[in-house]
Amino acid sequence: HVAKLVLDAFVWTGKDSHTLENRRKKLPDYISLNRRPIDRAFVQSIFDRDHPGTADQATISAFADAILTLDSSMPTGTYVDMCSKLPVVDPTQIKVPTLILRGEFDGIASLQDLIDFYVRLPHANKQFSVMKGISHASFQQKNYKMVYHILHSYLTMPDPIYEA
């Protein structure tokens, strides 16, 4: 049983996403290769793609060091799914309180796409938060404490006393 749901860096249909539009151009490659190479420049691009400066360079370097010790490539499945299978979630089927977190500069999910998802959520106890100065990877950003504050506040909010 899920009591509450939090969606962060969520992508619904990908509508109006310039990042996904660019990735779709390479979809045949992603499908045929199964893996794509990664290096330090790739990791840097994850943090600089949407809005350079939202993550601390020391965090980016530590993240790159950690993942590059594990592998030099990664599966293409998430790219294939985001470019060819969205949407994979039907908001009308989510029956629990839901919080949607979106970074101000998130270049993958457009604000309007997420608002369209939000208004279709049937549960009245729902929230939408746009986080200032954050791009897609909210927990690795300079403003990460704001993310934790919003998350903690939502998850510890008392249940409503009155429900019509």
What are these regions (language model features)?
Residues 6-16:
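Active-site nucleophile loop of the alpha/beta-hydrolase fold
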Residues 16-99:
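Alpha/beta-hydrolase
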Residues 128-148:
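Catalytic histidine-centered segment of alpha/beta-hydrolase-like enzymes
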Residues 2-3, 125:
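Core-facing hydrophobic residues within beta-strands of well-ordered domains
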Residues 107-113:
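Conserved alpha/beta-hydrolase "acid-adjacent" motif
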Residues 95-106, 132:
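Conserved strand-to-loop "acid loop" that flanks and positions the catalytic carboxylate
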Residues 147, 151, 155:
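Hydrophobic "lid"/C-terminal helical patch
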Residues 142, 156-164:
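Alpha/beta-hydrolase-fold serine-hydrolase catalytic core, especially in secreted/extracellular enzymes
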